[in-house]
Each structure stands twice: as C-alpha cells, then as structure tokens.
Amino acid sequence: LKALQGRLSELHNEVYRRRIPVVLAFEGWDAGGKGGAIKRLTQALDPRGYAVQPVSAPNDLEKSHHYLWRFWTAMPKAGHFTIFDRSWYGRVMVERIEGFCSGDEWRRAYAEINNMEESWANSGCIVLKFWMQIDKEEQARRFKERQENPDKQWKITEEDWRNRAKWDQYEVAVDEMLVRTSTTYAPWIIVEANSKYYARIKVLKTVVGAIENYLKEHK
C-alpha cells in the first residue's frame, strides 16, 4: 500500500507538470468501502491538487439545470484530480429504481453519459470508474458493525436499509449500467471489495497503471 501511494505521489507531480486532468468516480453497494478507498488515494496526493466531490440528491439550483450540469461544473482543472464519491450514475440506479426520473429519462441517460465521458477523454482527461462490489452477507455484517460502533453509527441510515431491501432491483440496474457504459475511454473497474485491504490495493494499482500508460502513450 505504502509503495503504491509513493508511486502515485510521484505521478501526481508528473500529471501536474503535464497538465493532465484526472477524473475518478466511485460507485458501489452501501458499505462497499468507497470512502476507505478514496481516503487511501488522497493520502498520496498533494492537497492543493485534488478535490473530493461527495454526491447526494441535487439541490434546487442543480435541479433547475440538466442533471449532468453539476458534474460538468466540478471537472478538474488541468493537472488536478477530481474524485467523485458517488456520481452521475445515480440517474440509472437510485433515480431509476425510486422513480425520481421517467423511464425515457433513464434509458436516454446511457448515451448522454457516454457522450459526456467521451468528450472529457477527447480533451485529454483520464477517466476511471470504480464499482465497489461486496456480497449481501458482507453488507449485512458491515451494517451491523456500524450500528454497534458509536463512532460509526452516523454512517448507517434508514435509507441504507431501504436500499438493501431492493437489492435484486439494484443488481439488475447495476448490471445494465456496467454493460452499457464501460468504454475504452472511461472503463468500469469492478473492485472485489469484501476484503477492504485488497480493494484499496486494487484501486491504487489501477490508478497508478492508468496514469503510467497514459504518460507512455502521450510522450
């Protein structure tokens, strides 16, 4: 872990020097380890060169725009990282399942999202998307652990339990999302996250590898 963080720190300097923007999006099951993976990434980055964007329900201003507007406005400056803790994929998951958008809207979203990500990549941006995959039993164990730990109780909400009750519906939506929006320019990386340590290593390795490859291809 430390060696990978050291390498990422070196690469961050190179990314800054070469003015390459980097977008990392994290999605996954509730309690899937998004926050822990993001924390291990940011420990390796210069605080002046990254922003973490936690994504929740849109506010009134955001609702008055196209649903992708708030993500466009959070794009990183050249040489910087933006890390999204949840992302624009809410459209084809929670909004689809909870009925916050129409069937036409979420079906149209796959192409809209692919076009947005392609335009980022075409402008010289590295785009990676991580799906943190845990099984239902591991999620139940983590929920219970959070409920019983006073320091972690804030992490578990009624909404988490409601989402869990719709696991099968979410599974269908997730599978369709991964199939329809994993591209060469903005791939999905499925992170087997039942082991938190393994997940954090895989995320770091993937980011390091993607930046190294980009630098080789764009000498």
Where are these predicted regions, by residue range?
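Glycine-rich phosphate-binding loop of ATP-dependent small-molecule kinases
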Residues: L1-K219
